């Protein structure tokens, strides 16, 4: 697995710079190394984890494809600056599994399936809310004035006699 390098004494303030440094491949003297677990801790502490689909893709990229692709996805995630504290534990579990040797592949698969279910539920909720917003209730028909009908009926009865 790859490691991210931060060229600063305050990594909490410059975490996106750490990912950018990793992507560019530049080196520095006072390096702080980031493992995928440390990346998750930074993301959760900065409250920038949401977009579980991107998290899922990044974890798969970190585990299967290449650390650089995973880091690029993480950079996009950090740049989004969106927050969802409820999903941070799922994100942390995914990246912890992606960065470590997998002892039990069933747990890894379970976490990915769980994340996919959460993503689909969030997407369904967004679609449902958009549909609810676009379909406006139709106006009820105007109330019928019974007095007019009664007058017309009375006139008809009067003239028909």
UniProtKB/Swiss-Prot annotation:
Its main location: host cell. It is a single-pass membrane protein. Glycans are attached at residues 14, 87. The chain crosses the membrane at residues 102-129. It is found in: Host membrane. Keywords: Early protein, Glycoprotein, Host membrane, Membrane, Transmembrane, Transmembrane helix. This is Early E3 17.7 kDa glycoprotein. It comes from Murine adenovirus A serotype 1 (MAdV-1).
């Amino acid at each position: 697995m790859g490691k991210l390098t931060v060229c600063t004494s305050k990594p909490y303030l410059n975490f996106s710079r750490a990912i950018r440094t990793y992507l560019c491949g530049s080196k520095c003297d006072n390096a702080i190394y980031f493992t995928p677990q440390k990346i998750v801790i930074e993301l959760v502490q900065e409250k920038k984890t949401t977009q579980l689909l991107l998290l899922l893709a990044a974890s798969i990229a970190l585990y299967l494809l290449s650390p650089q692709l995973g880091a690029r996805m993480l950079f996009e995630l950090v740049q989004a600056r969106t927050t969802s504290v409820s999903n941070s534990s799922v994100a942390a579990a995914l990246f912890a599994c992606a960065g470590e040797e997998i002892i039990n592949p069933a747990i890894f698969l379970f976490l990915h399936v769980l994340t996919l279910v959460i993503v689909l539920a969030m997407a369904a909720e967004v679609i449902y809310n958009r549909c609810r917003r676009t379909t406006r209730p139709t106006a009820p028909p105007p109330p019928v004035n019974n007095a007019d009908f009664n007058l017309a009926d009375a006139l008809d009865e009067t003239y028909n006699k």
